[in-house]
């Protein structure tokens, strides 16, 4: 289906427009505020498997319909360190006021919560209040990053495990480790952020069977089998390699856009270029599996 401009389903006419020649797509002519038919859901899943990032345009979602749509795709994932919306324990309100300074939540290339035993399979983000310009989300496709490595590098990485931790972001001395009353979001770091989890540097997607790199500069702090200096040299090369421009796409937000991405094979980066404008989003993650 990749490269097609219009994707016509068996019983639904869902328009899928690729964002690049490799991955990412805009989706139109589908209403996710109502329960999807089995055919619509199947078409959406097929597009997601093909493109890894879907920006579903012109939606009108309440918090309840947002949750209901997510639950058609899977169970909710666990969300640490951030206070959820009252009465909706799985929904985060990502808010940045127009005059708010300080670190932007979601900046830096990362895969959500890769420090968990079972990181999220996917993230869903919905635009409630969007700046007139700026605030794009950039994505980089890690299956492409893996494919572009030499056979020798693939062989070197295959048996190795990355060490993941939330310490740099949510540990006591991390970016969001201390309470800040000037911050709109209530982010509460704690000692649990110092814990580590090991996952394969190369993981296999459970649905597609495709291999991808599974590291990121925010949460990957070492390689289990290597000394620190050795691991740093390899990781720094991989961090640079992973964000090559030809592996990337960008989603330009509009009010009513829901973007969903596959955390198992995609990293993302929130771009901080809209100071002076308010931005509000709703976010959920979907439960994943232990990386293999």
Regions found by a protein language model. Name each.
Residues 2-258, 263-292:
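Non-heme Fe(II) oxygenase catalytic core, chiefly the N-lobe of the double-stranded beta-helix
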